[in-house]
Amino acid sequence: MDLENNTIHCSTFVQHTYIKLNPVGPIGAGRLPETRSVEEAQQYPTGWKFWLTILTMSALVVLGGLDTNIVATAVPSHASTRTPSPAASPLSPPATQRSSALTNRLTSVLSASYADSDIRDALETLSLRDIHNTPEVRRQLRLDVQKEVVDCNAEIVRDFGKVAEQLKRIGTVITSLNQTCDEMRKHISLARQDTAPVLEEASTLMNQKKEAETKQQLLDAFTKHFVVPDDDILVLTSLEDPINDQFFEVLARVKQVHRDCEALLGGENQRLGLELMDKSSRNLNSAYQKLYRWIQKEFKSLNLEDPRISSSIRRALRVLAERPSLFHSCLDFFAEARDYTLSDAFHYALTDAVSGTAGDSNVKPIEFSAHDPLRYIGDMLAWVHSTTVSEREALEALFVADGEELARGIQAGLSSEPWSRIDEHEEVAFDGQKALSDLVNRDLIGVSRALRQRVELVIQGHDDPVTCYKVVGLLSFYRTTFQKLLGPNSNLAELLVTLEKFTFGHFEALMKDVVSSLSTDHLALTPSEDLSTPQFLIDALEGLTSLMKTYEASFGADDTESTSDENRFTPVLRAAFDPFLELATSSAEELSNATARAIYLTNIHLTARTSVSEYSFVSTTHLNPISTKLSSLRIDLLEIQHRYLLDESGLQVLLTALEPFSPSSVAKSSTETEKQDSHPLESQPQQQPNLADIATLPAFQPEALIAVSQQLDDFLPSALMDATDNLKRLRSAAFVKSVTEEAVEAFCRDFEFVEGMIIGADEARGKVDVTRVDRGSETGAESEKGMEEGENGWGLRRLFPRTTGEIRVLLS
């Protein structure tokens, strides 16, 4: 075992020594890398391995762990042909066994890794000793190392001896310290026993001190929060002290105390909370009463025209809103004061004198224009409007500028005064604009009363319908203005609605009076000789035109609700147009001549249509009835002209004679025949009129027919002029022309019918009536005799030579 250990240590030592001191082999095999193991080094030349083996064996010999004979046997010669010596000791093991053991040992040594850090450190230490690789050094190396180890151990022992001496001294010191500590413990124990009662008493006193301090802090906090100083209470309730910022600060603090008292009522002992709440309630009531009186005093001297209204008044009103009863009472007082002030100002503007004081000489009183109702009423309404706007702006700055604050104050007041609610479940929301409008309405009650009296007096004393209607338009304009300014339910808006109805009623009464007086004036209702429009209707239409212009200027562009049946101007037409038109129409009954009556009515309706057609808001309701009436009158005039042409030309005689032969008469006869009871045995065949019979009619006898033809020839040259002159009293030339042209066209159609009958009669006279011949009656014989006379005698066409073309040319 020792040999094995020595071999391992020697091989390690040799390997490190070789690498460190002899990097190049004796035969130049090359440098062995320091990090290579023996297995890795086997790839180098054989010389390197040989020298490594020699060094290993030498080390073993030096260390005494291996016999030199074994080394000689184990190490091969440098030449490959060298063989081991056959000589062997008889007492030694066989050479083969020794060689095998050594080989195994060397193999294990050489197979070990020489890159171990311990081996490198050992070789490094060996290299630092500055020794030489000699046999002597190699033999003494172990001894030297052991000697150094022994020396080092001896030095360590000496050092530990010194340490032991120091430890003894330290132990002595520690023992002394322990004795001292024991004595101190005894003294401390005795002192603790003596001071324990004192400490307990001191701890008790400290706890009591803390409790007292806590109670003092609570008392201070309670006093600071719940107790109001007497000086502050005096500021809050004394009538001599002014209303200033300090008053509102104290009031806010007292209200906070009153609210916080509810927390004190939540405990078992409620006496303190009840007392504080009762005291704060009394103080608050006194403060609100003081504030209420102060606001009333300020309202008496308040000038709303001053743009710098005191901010303290606005603040006081916001605070007073928390007491709804006092707040509304204050508003009532303010409304009464403003009502008196504005009524006085309105009277001053009307008369320029209030309580004997003279007015401004540069401004004339409104009543100076009382003779002109329109201007007088307009000036009063303008003053009221200006005053309303100024009042609203001033009150808006006073009340509505802080509308949210007022709303919160009123809500808080309703909570404190639940009896102020009408319905306990209603939710009250403060509407600043509505409240402002209501207050302005109350301020203007006296002004509204005076305005109504004066307007009614002026209207009742005026008789001009046009002026009355202009006043209606003026009132309607201001009604719309005040509805936008104060709301549709305001007093002023309702007053103007009433005045508007009153004025329009007076207008209707005036128009009824005019119509009533005309209906009894026989001279005015008598148609003129020229059948022109009566003068009273012309005057009425002129007044109506003024009314329509007034309406158009005021409401025409905004009248978007008008329909074909009704609009805002329709009542005016019913009062100022329809009665006069009916009166003029009824006056035509005095004319016995139908032509004159038709012309007179046409002139009336043409004039009326001209007046109403210029304005859309009138034409939509009244133009259609007038146009319908004119269409009916036009038909009558057309019939008159047609009859005039037939009578003057003599053609009416021929048409009357030919009436049985007209298509309408034949159709009528056929219809009456079909209505009769028809049986095959009883019915007779319907006989068509024979055109040949026309020549037998009296009107178609030669003398009569020649007279008609001559009358026609005399009429035709001036027929158109005569027909136009027949309607010369009609005021519309275009109307006369259109009616005459249609009458001429009807006359031409009638002449064409007569001409056709004459030609047909002449043609029929050249034929035999088969039905009469078959019956063999005397009529058939007479017809044959007449035909013979027609062939040798006169013809209808020759006696009446005019043609339809000639007639159209002459009448064109």
UniProtKB/Swiss-Prot annotation:
Where is it found, in Gene Ontology cellular component terms? Golgi membrane; Golgi transport complex
The annotated region (Disordered) lies at 77-100, 665-688
Cell compartments where the protein resides: Golgi apparatus membrane
**Bias (Basic and acidic residues):** 671-680
- Cite the InterPro entries for this sequence: COG6, COG6_C, COG6_N
Q: Where is the composition biased (Low complexity)?
A: 77-96
Keywords from UniProt, A to Z, are: Golgi apparatus, Membrane, Protein transport, Transport
Q: Which GO terms describe its biological process?
A: intra-Golgi vesicle-mediated transport; protein transport
Q: Specify the protein's topology with respect to the membrane.
A: Peripheral membrane protein
Task: Please report which protein family the annotation says this sequence is part of.
Answer: Belongs to the COG6 family.
Function noted in UniProt:
Acts as a component of the peripheral membrane COG complex that is involved in intra-Golgi protein trafficking. COG is located at the cis-Golgi, and regulates tethering of retrograde intra-Golgi vesicles and possibly a number of other membrane trafficking events.
Name under which the protein is recorded:
Conserved oligomeric Golgi complex subunit 6
Lineage start: Eukaryota, Fungi, Dikarya, Ascomycota, Pezizomycotina
